[in-house]
Amino acid sequence: MAQFHLQIKLPDRPGSLGTVASAIGFAGGDIRNLSVVKNEDGEGVDDLVVAIPGSDPTDLLNVLNAIGGVQVISVEKV
């Protein structure tokens, strides 16, 4: 499994992080680490380390980008 560090922006409302976590699981990913970087003005920025099968994060990024209000800011292989 390859690991990727993702920084995402998401709405600061109940259930937003749960939706992201479910999408990561749907794409076959496993969250290895999570931290809240910023939380203000109705938006949050979170750092995640996610392990995925294979080495191409395209499916994971497509699933995350399909969630309304969620934006992948950056992605890099760990």
Regions of interest found by a model, annotated:
Residues 1-78:
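A conserved regulatory-domain signal marking ACT and ACT-like small-molecule sensing domains
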